[in-house]
A protein has these predicted regions:
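Alpha-helical transmembrane segments in multi-pass membrane proteins
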Residues: 2, 6, 10, 15, ...
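Alpha-helical transmembrane segments within multi-pass membrane transporters and channels
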Residues: 9-30, 54, 136, 140-145
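Cytosolic, membrane-interface loops and tails of multi-pass inner-membrane proteins
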Residues: 20-51, 107
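Interfacial segments of multi-pass membrane proteins
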Residues: 44-49, 70-74, 110-140, 152-162
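A cross-family phosphate/adenosyl-ligand binding-site feature
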Residues: 55, 77-78
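Membrane-helix exit/interface motif
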Residues: 68-77, 99-103
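Interfacial loop-to-helix junctions that mark the boundaries of transmembrane helices
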Residues: 78-84, 118
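Membrane-helix interface "capping/anchor" motifs
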Residues: 100-106, 135-149
Length: 163
């Protein structure tokens, strides 16, 4: 039951669509421009650096907040399961970001939210991921390749180290 509660907590946190809300503030539906995505990269390309950074921060923090709430709720009762429950909350936040019910399940791609999950569960891995991301993007000029590489690294880290 705790796992389901953590996913729901995460999903609710993930529903905050920073790019969509910023776009609405500027009288633009970000999903009608660029790639049609409500995430950081499309917001950056469509509305500029300021909007992109605000969106990144909001998308990043939604996972951090979800994990923080789970720590507050479960650290005393389930200390041995806290890492797992944190992952459930973080993955719920990514799902809420990618599939917000109030936007007909059309959100972002979850990269900034996943970065927040990596940071919240393993800050050292986040440092490594950021370096790898920027090296790949710097060499290839493809944000998507850097993003996919980070997701793969995170999955490998979780499988190998159980984090």
């Amino acid at each position: 039951m705790e796992r389901l509660v953590c996913v729901i907590i995460g999903y609710v946190c993930g529903l905050l669509q920073t790019g969509y809300l910023y776009g609405k503030w500027k009288h633009i539906d970000i999903r009608q421009h660029g790639s049609g995505n409500a995430g950081t990269t499309n917001t950056l390309r469509t509305l500029g650096w300021k909007a992109g950074m605000i969106t990144f921060l909001g998308d990043f923090l939604k996972c951090v907040v979800a994990v923080w709430i789970v720590h507050i709720l479960y650290s005393q009762a389930y200390p041995e399961e806290l890492a797992l429950l944190s992952m459930y909350a973080g993955m719920g936040a990514v799902l809420g970001h990618n599939y917000p019910f109030y936007l007909k399940f059309k959100g972002g791609k979850g990269i900034a939210a996943t970065a927040g999950l990596i940071f919240a569960t393993n800050p050292m891995m986040m440092l490594i991921a950021a370096i790898v991301f920027w090296v790949i993007v710097g060499i290839t000029r493809y944000v998507s390749l850097g993003s996919l590489t980070i997701v793969v690294l995170f999955v490998v880290e979780v499988v190998l180290y159980g984090q």
